[in-house]
From Swiss-Prot:
Part of the ABC transporter complex CcmAB involved in the biogenesis of c-type cytochromes; once thought to export heme, this seems not to be the case, but its exact role is uncertain. Responsible for energy coupling to the transport system. The gene is ccmA. One of its GO terms (cellular component) is plasma membrane. Belongs to the ABC transporter superfamily. CcmA exporter (TC 3.A.1.107) family. This is Cytochrome c biogenesis ATP-binding export protein CcmA. It comes from Roseobacter denitrificans (strain ATCC 33942 / OCh 114). It is found in: Cell inner membrane. It is a peripheral membrane protein. Residues 3-206 form the ABC transporter domain. GO terms for molecular function: ABC-type heme transporter activity; ATP binding; ATP hydrolysis activity. NCBIfam families: ccmA. ATP binds at G35, P36, N37, G38, S39, G40, K41, T42. Its EC number is 7.6.2.5. The complex is composed of two ATP-binding proteins (CcmA) and two transmembrane proteins (CcmB). It catalyses: heme b(in) + ATP + H2O = heme b(out) + ADP + phosphate + H(+).
Length: 206
């Protein structure tokens, strides 16, 4: 199922940040969000993931299909690596964590408490959770933060494998992940203009 976004307006702190956002994300496709810091990429991802409502526009194809990885890894520090993955697998009604351990080279760390991991190891564990959700649409906010070159390659390989099985990915990143056939959406030109701000504010109070 294609994720479709039509004429979306998103807000931060009640202020419109982006307007006129439209795109389709098909099965097996990746879309890279680009733009300077503060341009609205995180706000757009949070809106698409259902963490905040849009001010205007339509989103379809996301219902119970999204796995979202934010800046924070959100790990349970007193659980081991394997226990963290089992916890999140259970949340999504699943149990197999072996592919996640393998994809992010976490086998040797499986019994380590998450709180004792390095920043890069924590990030790998946070990203590995995507594989245990079973969700077909991945949305990721700067997923390569704290990762070294080898770990970035692991992540890119995991995304490619996900796309090959019909999954899709929407990724905000400043680096080239080398994903084949990935499209790019620059949010810079979609910054809400003063006219859009006024119109959106009026509509919000109708």
């Amino acid at each position: 199922m294609t994720v479709s976004v039509d004429d979306l307006c998103v807000t931060r702190g009640g202020v419109p940040i982006l307007s006129g956002v439209s795109f389709d994300l098909a099965e097996g496709a990746a879309l890279i969000l680009q733009g300077p810091n503060g341009s609205g990429k995180t706000t757009l991802l949070r809106t698409l993931a259902g963490l905040q409502p849009p001010l205007a526009g339509q989103i379809s194809g996301t219902e119970d299909r999204i796995a979202y990885a934010a800046h924070s890894d959100g790990l349970k520090s007193m659980l081991s690596v394997a226990e963290n993955l089992r916890f999140w697998a259970a949340v999504f009604g699943r149990s197999d964590i072996a592919p996640a351990l393998q994809a992010f080279d976490l086998h040797d760390l499986a019994d380590r408490l998450a709180g004792t991991l390095s920043a890069g190891q924590k990030r790998r564990l946070g990203l590995a959770r995507l594989l245990v959700t079973g969700r077909p649409v991945w949305m990721l906010d700067e997923p390569t933060v704290s990762l070294d070159k080898r770990a970035v390659e692991m992540f890119a390989a995991a995304v490619e494998a996900h796309l090959a099985t019909g999954g899709s990915a929407l990724i905000a990143t400043h680096i080239d992940l080398g994903l084949r056939d990935a499209q790019v959406l620059d949010v810079g030109p979609l910054r809400a203009s003063p006219t859009a701000l006024a119109g959106a504010s009026d509509e919000a109070f109708l």
